[in-house]
Amino acid sequence: MLVLTQPFLLMPRKLWVSSALRSDDQKQPPFSSSSTHAETPEHAEEQYQQQQSPPRYTDQAGEESEDYESEEQLQQRILTAALQFVPDFGWSADAIAEGAKSLDMSAAAGGMFEDGGSELVLHFVTQCNLQLTELLEKEHKLVQLGTSEKKPTAQFLRDAVKARLRMHIPYIEQWPQALGMLLLPRNIPSSLKLLSAMVDDMWHYAGDQSTDVSWYTSRAVLTGIYNSTELVMLQDSSPDFEDTWKFLENRISEAMTMGNSMKQVASTGEAVIQGLMGAAVTLKNLTGLNQRR
């Protein structure tokens, strides 16, 4: 597994805030000690309190609000708001600018993101993974409480992959663009980290406790299944992606019927090949070939 030197959304970047968002109140000259002798103590205290107040931002209506969130939190809000504009603007800085405006911020807030489109895609993938983890954790607790029966491993993994891929449906037409961004060299470390963490969560909640080579094998196989199913989904025109889910069920069943280590090794190699072939299909999608109809 590749190790990120700067994990996305885990290590805040150098904090800065666009000057376009700053209020004119912060541009006042520093408090002059000489002026205190000419004014009342009450007036001097009022000026002091104004200088000690936290930073303020100006919205599009010209109204000010105090800043009680970090830059990272502000970025998360903007990126989340931008997702609703992806169907119209794609995974782009334009979608981020629209997201900022929907929060009554200046479109200049988009300048907070060095690589807008890629950061938006990675934010979406991160949020989807978090939603999946919450879903799996909730199901796990129900089993522990005895209010729900534990699913067979094959069914659990199938449902987990299906639930995760369904999160792409609102952006299915724009997903080839997203995959292209995730495959960019600068984004591959973050993409692999998110993918491996997601697959590991699936196996963890499925009850996998292996510590030998099968730990790596099982995750490699599931990664191949996830990637290949994701690409089938892009080409699927059946109602509610029925063909995609049939493909997924068949791949999971095949993985569960592996009987010995030799078959496991072969399947691991096949998973790697599937991943490479998937990348090629994705590039075709991005150039307008084999588009989903």
Curated annotation (Swiss-Prot):
Signal sequence, start to end: none
Pathway: Cofactor biosynthesis; ubiquinone biosynthesis
Positions that bind a 1,2-diacylglycero-3-phosphoethanolamine: 219
Lineage top rank: taxon: Eukaryota
Start-end of Polar residues biased regions: 29-38
Protein localization: Mitochondrion
Molecular function per GO: isoprenoid binding; lipid binding; protein homodimerization activity
Alphabetically ordered keywords of this record: Lipid-binding, Mitochondrion, Transit peptide, Ubiquinone biosynthesis
Main location group: mitochondrion
Cellular component, GO annotation: mitochondrial inner membrane
Region listing for Disordered, in residue ranges: 21-73
One GO biological process term: ubiquinone biosynthetic process
Compositionally biased spans, kind Acidic residues: 61-72
Subunit structure: Homodimer. Heterodimer; two heterodimers of COQ7:COQ9 come together on the same side of the lipid pseudo-bilayer and form a curved tetramer with a hydrophobic surface suitable for membrane interaction. These two tetramers assemble into a soluble octamer with a pseudo-bilayer of lipids captured within. Interacts with COQ7; this interaction allows ubiquinone (CoQ) isoprene intermediates presentation to COQ7 and facilitates the COQ7-mediated hydroxylase step.
Function: Membrane-associated protein that warps the membrane surface to access and bind aromatic isoprenes with high specificity, including ubiquinone (CoQ) isoprene intermediates and presents them directly to COQ7, therefore facilitating the COQ7-mediated hydroxylase step. Participates in the biosynthesis of coenzyme Q, also named ubiquinone, an essential lipid-soluble electron transporter for aerobic cellular respiration.
UniProt remark on domains: Structurally similar to the bacterial FadR protein (fatty acid metabolism regulator protein).
Similarity comment: Belongs to the COQ9 family.
Protein name as it appears in the record: Ubiquinone biosynthesis protein COQ9-B, mitochondrial
